[in-house]
From Swiss-Prot:
Cofactor binding mode and count: May bind 1 zinc ion per subunit.
Cofactor(s), names only, from the UniProt record: Zn(2+)
The protein's name in its UniProt record: Protein translocase subunit SecA 1
Keyword Transport annotated: yes
Family: Belongs to the SecA family.
Amino acid sequence: MIGALARKFFGSANDRRVKGYQARVKAINGLEPEIAALSDEALRARTAEFRQQLADGKTLDDILVPAFATVREAGKRTLGQRHFDVQLIGGMVLHEGDIAEMKTGEGKTLVATLAVYLNALAGKGVHVVTVNDYLASRDAGWMAQIYTFLGLTTGVIVHGLDDVERKAAYACDITYGTNNEYGFDYLRDNMKYRLEDMVQREHFYAIVDEVDSILIDEARTPLIISGPLDDRSEFYNTIDTFMPNLEKVADYEVDEKQRTVALTEAGMEKIETLLRDAGQLKGDSLYDVENVSVVHHINQALRAHSLFTRDKDYIVRDDEVVIIDEFTGRMMQGRRYSEGLHQALEAKEHVTVQPENQTLASITFQNYFRMYKKLSGMTGTALTEADELADIYKLEVVEIPTNLPIARLDEDDEVYRTQNEKYAAILAEVERANARMQPVLVGTASIEKSEVLADYLKKNGYKLIDFGDPKSMRKLYAAARAGKPAKLFAVLNARFHEQEAYIVAEAGVPGAITIATNMAGRGTDIKLGGSLEMRAQFETADLADEAEKDAKIAEIKADIERFRDMVLKAEDVVEIEPAKGSKPAKTVTRPGGLYIIGSERHESRRIDNQLRGRSGRQGDPGRSKFFLSLEDDLMRIFGSDRLDTMLQRLGLKDGEAITHPWINKALEKAQQKVEARNFDIRKNLLKYDDVQNDQRKVIFDQRVDLMMNESVAETVADMRHAFVDDLVTKHVPENQYAEQWDVAGLKEELRRVLDIDLPVDEWAAEEGIADEELLSRIENRVDEHMAAKVGQWGPDVMRYVEKTILLQTLDHLWREHLVMLDHLRQVIGLRGYGQRDPLQEYKSEAFSLFEALIAHLREAVTGQLMRVEIVPPEEEQPVLPAMEVHKLDPHTGEDEMAFAQGNFAQASLAPVVSADRSSRDPGNPASWGKVGRNEDCPCGSGKKYKHCHGR
């Protein structure tokens, strides 16, 4: 209460921050007449002037005011749109690296141009991130008019481009693309073997559109590049045949709140019997070590059958199981559940079971976007997640005032006992709205629910619009002109993804009824009366004559103006019956505009707010209302059975609803609980992923360093010496008598790994030989062996072979390391039962695994280079092609062999240049530069560097 009083007098922190921008807004407005007087050429020349000012030492903040004024004028000249003052504030928030919360219809796409232009002047590339290819292409094409006018280049990254096209797009001043494409390009770049093949530049500045969707809803979804493993499709199908034999409660228990499923004792016994009969059980018990993978697959099959619902979590299309995004209702083509879950779903649906995949590279959006030096975002709904965005991404949410006040009426929820009663009430409300020609958008939580509602409408005489038939929408327009309901409706879910933008854009036509899953269609405005752009695109496509096109567009404009007026007047006038003995009946008028009907509450308040926000854009009137039932997922999970019993006792009849602000508050509390739990899950997962992310950075940075160096000879030599050093230390420990040395073991290891037979036993038998002397002799012989290869094939060939083997071996071992980290992560939680912190245990063991990876890398690279045989070309080739390296077979253990072909005389590979030795100061290690492990230590001790400062 005191806080509310203080905010009333002093304003909130958000109000104060917004107020702080007013001086710069005033300055930008003051420049408007001067800049408006410039010619097009003079306006375009300002870009070069700004860049020169930056080169002379000015900062981006110093030139913000004139740069924003320039963009505003360019917007007026190219798009006919002038940035409002509140849009200038939004642009400043984006430039400062925070999140601008702007309501639907406030022009977020146009706002981005301000910060994009300013930051693109730095010449390091600006990435604009959208949620799908359509929006990336649309926004790039639309806003490029401003950028091109001002002399900047614009590229777009969409699915299907080759590397040459991608590299060209990233080289532009401004690049538009989807979060998936940016993330996958980063992963693919770090699997390349030449710097010139990499497509991305540095991660300088990104603006994320629909930032809540990408940084929160998809934060837990890793991007994974994978390769196929052995085909085990028959095994999945066998396991799936067991599922109908299991009974819920008796054989397994489901926790819907936690999304987990577990076998009971009876279920385990039943599964053991079924496995034994099918010949799939090894040993006596299901939980014997040999059956660990079997138990895993049983659990995944159980999850597939009990936690995943067709047409809600996934759909089946063209013999494939396609995941549905739970937040947007969109199909996630190309995405697959990991750890065998997707295969279990394929077996459940009796489609072709695809082979399991091995992870080759992965990253989460959380870690990808945190790589940018500056990150900002835009959305209509972020305040409910402000704590998470600040905690994880260090992004502050700033609520930008609307240009015009919001005139939408948000009504209290209506709660019914059963889903059938709820759907009947929704149908009745839709019919009432349709009768007065008010457009209705019905939001559903899944494809399944959207199709249930569609069936209700069909049974009551409504027809589904066929978007494949161009005449379908004409019927809707004709009915609107006549002022009569057409009784037509559209469905927007994953099945109709292709027409998404068109369906959404026309949801504001009088009498339109649109059923949409969650926030499908985000990014496309619903304009009252319809969309001029969409209608013009479809209705003038077949017209070749320009005069005919102009006439058609004029006709469409007149239509839309009339339709908009109809929608605004579609008010709902209701006479409320008085209570007995009270005042006479009163009349309530509810606004026209777009009517949003929610068919159930989502787990997240933000998703509900997004649905509401589709109505009431730019000061238009509108209304929203949620219809709920005690059988809805959120209500059921949070104990609606108790409420149902109470309502029955109170005498709530079938078809009656309860409506009260208290119910809204109770639901909001339930949603807050779910949001808090999901935040904790995401935060905890990030802590684990950060461990892998730190290691990923080291490996990826190392790869880039290796590719930047034309020669890795010194790196390879260091690895060789380190491996030999470790090998000798293992078998010939320091401060031990020669009689205690494991000479035979050392000799055998040298033969096995390096394929070299050295008289180690004879050297060890020499009187007074020390371990350092033994090490020195072995290293010298190994170096001589490698020098002979260089002499035989030439330094250019060996440099090429060394780099290729080093990079490919690093990739091979990194992939194996990822698998081990995944396995470790799955079981580490059990350490909690032993009173140990699973996260600390994971960090410790992951570090040990990483150390082992480095040791294995030294051994593998050294061994391969010692054994490598190079096949000479049969005839002269004009260019040096790629080398093929045959990797170690993990099953047979056969050695890797590298084969190179081509004219090696043309290779122009130079050795790594170390620091000038004459400039080394013995007392200042910082002046030594890179020192070889076998060089004398620059400190003057007389010892080798590896035994002195290089230890």
